[in-house]
Amino acid sequence: MTRIIVVTSGKGGVGKTTSSAAIGTGLAQKGKKTIVIDFDIGLRNLDLIMGCERRVVYDFINVIQGDATLNQAIIKDKKTNNLFILPASQTRDKDALTRIGVEKVLTELIKMNFDFIICDSPAGIETGAILAIYFADEAIITTNPEVSSVRDSDRILGIISSKSKRAEKNITPIKEYLLLTRYNPRRVKKGEMLSMTDVLDILQIPIIGVIPEDQSVLRASNQGESIILDINSNAGCAYSDTVNRLLGEERHFRFIEEEKKSFLRRLFGR
């Protein structure tokens, strides 16, 4: 059975698209047929992060408006088997995204036997965000450990509970998970960031992953590669743990405590 997962947030710049790409790639690595859809009409960042921007001929809106078939618009990832991308339009009006159009595309993808459909939502409550949430079975709320980011995530939780198809039909609600990004235990210790416990106390939803602040994320993005492919990076390992939890496996949370320096590192001040 296909699982439709929206990756969303109340605030921009929290690593939502990076997370969508990493989770989609990780699921495909596990043998799950996965497609990542960019709902951010007008910006189109997903294909850049996944390194396929030059291969975009048709997009999500072309399919909705009947200018192309889904098979024409879907891009197969060259690095990872089982991984596909449906890019957003960079030039179209955001209102070109319609509920009927999105439902048609999702229904067709389900018929194509995708195991996972990852919906990369724009931040906030614009049309793309509402439609990405509307059809979801599960939601990953991406937030930084900062008061403003957590507060905006709380607003998104309200939208998920009231504006989804599941809420309308009064059936099992969307499963909600917290993904905490750019976590820095040293700054938490200094009181410059909220702790994981603080965020959980505020949002009151299960946590699926904690992604540490890591310069490797920017390097991977600039190279058009998903960070999860960098197995030597802390962020890549944390995303891998997140994917395993999404598949029902238990993983302890790494990178949530300040790394203790060895004697030599303390001696030489490194």
From Swiss-Prot:
ATP binds at residues 11-18. Pfam families: AAA_31. It is a peripheral membrane protein. Keywords: ATP-binding, Cell cycle, Cell division, Cell membrane, Membrane, Nucleotide-binding, Septation. GO terms for cellular component: cytoplasmic side of plasma membrane; cytosol. It comes from the Bacteria. ATPase required for the correct placement of the division site. Cell division inhibitors MinC and MinD act in concert to form an inhibitor capable of blocking formation of the polar Z ring septums. Rapidly oscillates between the poles of the cell to destabilize FtsZ filaments that have formed before they mature into polar Z rings. NCBIfam families: minD_bact, PRK10818.1. This is Septum site-determining protein MinD. The lineage of its organism: Bacteria, Pseudomonadati, Pseudomonadota, Gammaproteobacteria, Enterobacterales. The gene is minD.
